[in-house]
């Protein structure tokens, strides 16, 4: 059964879209990532114009992150205070990212910068996560005790001034690194057209040492706010939000996210981190392969502006 | 039956108002408006044409080339080159006001119908359509062998929006022809131009044009116009709908 998408201006199979929503929703609920870095390329593959894909995915991400945030809020796993501090940096970062996006597009190298950023970010984060979680699993397998966090063992950047206590996350750290992380996520998110959850979760876990589940829950809350802002921004500036596409995706996505959230809680934290690390690494490799392999056609055609 | 009725009617029309001075044509489309609704997956339109043979001394047109052009858009064609192991866009060419949809339907392969010069002048055949490029500060069409031009045609053909069918025009009687114009589901919305040219012994004889419209209606149109005219409202409504769906799913699946 096909459905015509009024803004994307093409017919697609409704079941393909639903399945896509459920699969990506499952992953986003499980790992607390928005899923944009998976969904956007898949939609473009289906023939949806990139501008419409990026804008419409934000509606799907808003819906599934809201659903996930509610679940985590009820389980009291969201660190609202940490989320708000991250947001102050995040919103400034988004603005800087939008400006960088415009400058790079003017010089015609936006695609390349996006691809290289993807490869570097995903490759680094994926490798770090996989290595760390494998070490943790190995320790457990050998029956060794995990390192207990000692209060005095904070790295230098957490010992900077303006310290703040985040009770939910059980950390007492300087706000400077928190705001900086928020800024970086906002910047990369705007530049790469993603929610940034898959970068934020490891950053919270490894840099700020927030417990895994709290990191996931707080990242979901952040995704919710940034994606709701993104819907409005895209709708007003580009008119590229396809409500029909978004609705089908979000119905599948929210259902998938519910199961994903449960699956995420059923798994031990180390295994969850290993899986997310592998996923991030796989997407990074995929982008790298695309850039290195000789393309089928050395020429590509894009529609100028017109915001179609 | 409707397919037969149309050419018969046209024949009557031609006989009634015959002007023998030049070979005239009467054209008719099975519908002049393609409407896009939620189950739209593409459509086909049938074009009927009747050629008035004119005075017996004149050669009867032997060939027909139908060209359908969708609304114009500007495109950029990029060329990639390997740089430090990565494929990078190194060069680009702007195609200004190129048709977003281009169908060439002919009674036989265009190169058999007339000389390359004539075809080029008449813009008959996929390779002979004028595609204006911006080269530096100049605007011009280039030779058909230009790699950017060929790449542009190749990509558009792969997208199913450009095509040439050498057997797309069929004569159902000596002076009556029929052409089927496929409109794919991804066809852009807007005004389309149908140009029919007839040839006899390699020279153009007559030409006729029709217009065709592809438009969204009902729900599709409502959504598209709302997004255009009330972007704030549309954005807010979409955002609220998203939150609503998220909330409902959360409540529906609540277990604790």
Would you name each region that the model predicts?
Chain B
Residues 182, 205-235:
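Short, aromatic-rich amphipathic segments at membrane interfaces
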Residues 235, 242-256:
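Juxtamembrane interface at the cytosolic side of transmembrane helices
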Residues 7-16:
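Bacterial N-terminal signal peptides
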Residues 23-39:
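N-terminal edge beta-strand
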Residues 51-54:
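Short solvent-exposed capping/turn motifs at the termini of beta-strands
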Residues 190-196:
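A short tyrosine-centered beta-strand micro-motif
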Residues 18-22:
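Sec/Tat signal peptide C-region and signal peptidase I cleavage site
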Residues 82-188:
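Membrane-proximal low-complexity regions enriched in glycine and acidic/polar residues
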